[in-house]
Amino acid sequence: MKTAYAALAAGLSALALSGPAQAQVEVQWWHSMTGGLNEWVNDLARQFNESQKDYKVVPTFKGNYDESMTAAVAAFRAGNAPHILQVFEVGTATMMSAKGAIKPVGEVMKQSGVAFDPKAYVPAVSGYYTAPNGEMLSFPFNSSTTIFYYNKDAFKAAGLNPDKAPTTWPEVTLAAAKLKAAGYKCPYTTSWMSWVHLESFSTWHNTLFATQNNGFGGASARLAFNSPLHLRHFENLANMSKQGLFVYKGRASVAIPSFVSGECAMFTGSSGSYADVSKGAKFAYGLAPLPYYQDVPGAPQNTVIGGASLWVMSGKKPAEYKGVAKFFSFISTPEVQSASHKRTGYLPVTTASYKLTEESGFYKQNPGTDVAVTQMIRKVTDKSRGIRLGNYVQIRAIEDEELEQVWNGKKTAKEALDAIVTRGNEQLERFQKANKS
């Protein structure tokens, strides 16, 4: 008995000397990923949590991008915002203007003493999320761009070369006509109408989407996409729609299942849709660069970034910011970046991760998976760097509303584009007035 008491006393003494076990620092991460991408986000957090014992990242789905931003604003006002918020690319200007609500990622990394080199990131990606003073504001995460998908089996059935995707928009029209003649009721569709056919279309053709270098030059930017080139493209799409060669399926990513199921033979959308296509398509498919108009000088240039970045909210403790910095460092390693790129189709946002993926033989084994990267690693121009406009969530809704009038035959392409520019500029004027320094 004495021996047992002695052992117990010794144990308690040792426990007292060692002190209480240090609790893990929790880092709350709000995101908008669904389906397989939600699993990917959870896996990243789990891998980081298992790699060390000091920090625990807790991912939470907060609805689509609009909903998560709204929830974050409410949470910030209530004093319980997350540490990390995933924000889609068109919310960049809005987040930049949210003075006091965010902490620049460059500042977070520096103050936490965690190595961080903005030059390691693909310029077209890092440039989008960088302030005029050169400081990176948010952390590139699920960066994507617009690409062309096509059903090789459908091409073969229509007498088209399954190994040769259309490279120009006139070729897309001709391919669509052959597919329709072969019995396909949906030869071509698209997701993200404004991103693909207005934003990326503009940068791909090295033509202005808005003045002030698409908003990068200042808040006085105004929309400029009712140009002859944009009008030509939308008149062509309107004619394709009337002939049943282009079928509008809906806003945002609604059209993806129509391609994956085999209903639609050609599809333009996010490189991030590769995860859905590779998992669900029961046919041979191909990936190719976005089509363009061959007679436009400077085309093709580069497509515009999509997806989202991770913003760090203000008002947290230094220890928590260090956890954020450590997590960002972990998910930006070449190995983690490369694995994420292969799994999702999102861009490898660092040059090192792209090279690692290339050296692994992935692109040779999966032809076309490098298309998104090659479209983005080109040197950008002032016209093709990206889009940075305030109130752009509202402007995108206006774009969808007006263009839907074209697809249902109620407006001409010119009427719709002019209306978007007029209504959109009203939103830009409001944003400019609300954010005068």
Task: Report the location of each language-model feature.
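Extracytoplasmic/periplasmic substrate-binding proteins
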Residues: 32, 197-200, 207, 231-323
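Extracytoplasmic "Venus flytrap"/periplasmic binding protein-like
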Residues: 47-121, 157-167, 258, 265-266, ...
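A structural signal for short loop-to-beta-strand junctions that line the ligand-binding cleft
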Residues: 74, 82-83, 114-154, 186, ...
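Hinge/lid segment of periplasmic solute-binding proteins
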Residues: 88-147, 173, 199-203, 286-289, ...
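C-terminal lobe and pocket-closing loops
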Residues: 94-95, 99, 110-111, 272-283, ...
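Extracytoplasmic/periplasmic solute-binding protein
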Residues: 130-141, 146, 156, 170-222, ...
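Conserved C-terminal helix/tail region of periplasmic/extracytoplasmic solute-binding proteins
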Residues: 156, 162, 183, 375-437
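Glycine-centered hinge/linker elements that transmit conformational signals in sensory
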Residues: 173-179, 216-249
